[in-house]
Amino acid sequence: MAKQAIKKGVGIKKTGLHSFKEKHGLIPENNGSYTSVSNADKPIDWILMPKAFVSATRLPGIPLNTVCSVIGHSNVGKSTLINHAIAAAQRQGYIPVIIDTENSFSFQYAQSMGFKCEPIYGDVEVESVDPETGDVTITTENQIIYWDGAFLYYNNKILCDKFGNWDYNQGKQVSKKRNVAVVEDVAMCINTLLDAQDNGEIDQGFLFVWDSVGSIGCYKEYNAKGIGNPQWTAAAISAAFNRIANDRIPSSKKISSKYNNTFLYVNKVWMDAMTNPVGPAIMQTKGGKSLKYATRLEILMGGQLTSGVKRLTATYKGSDYSYGIETKIKILKNHLDAPHNVCYEGKMIASDVGFVDPEDLDDYKKNHISNILKKLQEITNTDKIITVDDIEFKEIEETD
C-alpha cells in the first residue's frame, strides 16, 4: 500500500513563543511601572554590618529580601549580631520589627550599637518589704515605662494582647484570649504587618527579627495543657510560616515589588546523639527544618559542641570583669548569587559597644579603659583608685 504524503504544519497557525507571552499577558509593559509578571530581580542589597563582620564573613551584611538565620549556643554573640542588624536597618530607612519571645531584648544594649529609641518615663508604684518587721511600704518611683522610636516591638504579652483571641485549629477569632503566646502568633504578627504594607498603611520596608524560634510552643501544645511534643511545634511552624518564608519575603526581591522585606530569626542549637549513635553527635536546631530549608543565609556563632568562645577579662586582686568575648562566626549555608555565594569563617569580638575586629582589640582596650576601670572599681568596692597598671588582662578559652 502506498504511503500518503503528509505536509507538516498544514492547518496549524504558526505563532512564536513571544506572541504567546504577549497574548496571555506574560510580558510586562515597558512603561517604567512593571507588574507582577516581571521575573527580574532587584540588584542584591544589604543591611550593612560593621567591619568585624565583613572581615570575618567576606559579606557586606545581611542580604535584603531573604530569610536568614543566626544559630548557636548561649552567650556566643547572637544578640550582638541582631542588635547591629536592627540599628543598621533603622539607619537605612527600614522598620525593625523586634519579636522578642525570649523576653530578653535590651534597649540599652541596642542603643550602644546605634539603635535609636527614646525612653518614656512614668510614675510606678513599688512595694518594698522590711526584712526585720515584714512591713510592706508602697512608694512611687519615676521609671521607664515605654521605649519609643522608629521600630515595632512585640513580646509575649503584646502578642497575646493582639493575637491571643485566635483559635488556630478553627481558623477564627474567639471571645476568650490566651495568656500564652504561640508560634502561630508570630506568623500572624508578620502577616498582619505585611498586609498593612500592601494596603498602604505603612510605606516602608521591614526587617523582621524573631528571637528565638525555640522559645515558645505551638497552639496544639497550648491546648494540651503543657504536654509538649517537638514534632507538633515543627509542624505548626511549617504550616504557619510556609507563605512567609517561601513567598511573601522572597517575592520582595522582584523589581515589581515596591518594598524590601527581610526576615532574620535566631535559633539555639542542641546536640543530637540519637541520629548517629555510633558516631559524633550532630548539631540540630529547634523548630524542625521547614524554616531552615527556606533560609538563604545561615550564620553559626560560636562552636558546635560547645560555645567555643574566649572570655576577655580584666582582673584586679582576684576580681574579674568580662569586657567581651572572642567568638567564632561561620557561614554554614549560603544560597546567594555569585559573587556573594561564599562560606567563610572567622572571629569577632562581641563587646559592650558591639562587634570589634580582633586586630583592633588593643585599640578597643585603650579607648575603653576608663569604663573597664570603672566597672572593676564597682565590683571590688575598694577605696583605692584602680589604674591600668593594677589590672591584668586575660583570655579564658572554652575549647570547641
Segments from the language model and where they lie:
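Short, hydrophobic/amphipathic alpha-helical packing segments
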Residues: N83, V183-N191, S238-N246
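Conserved catalytic network of the ASCE P-loop NTPase/AAA+ motor domain
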Residues: P60-P63, A88-Q92, L193-D203, R248-Y259, ...
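Extended hydrophobic secondary-structure segments that form protein cores and membrane-embedded regions
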Residues: V70, I99, L207-D211, L264-Y265, ...
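Detector for small/aliphatic-rich hydrophobic stretches
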Residues: M1-N75, T80-I99, D167, D400
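Short His-Asn-centered micro-motif
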Residues: I71-H73, I99-E102, V266-K268, M301
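C-terminal regions of RecA-like/P-loop NTPase motor modules
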Residues: M1-A40, T306-D400
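Phosphate-binding/switch region of NTP-binding enzymes
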Residues: Q231-S351
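Conserved inter-motif catalytic segment of the P-loop NTP-binding fold
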Residues: Q92-P230
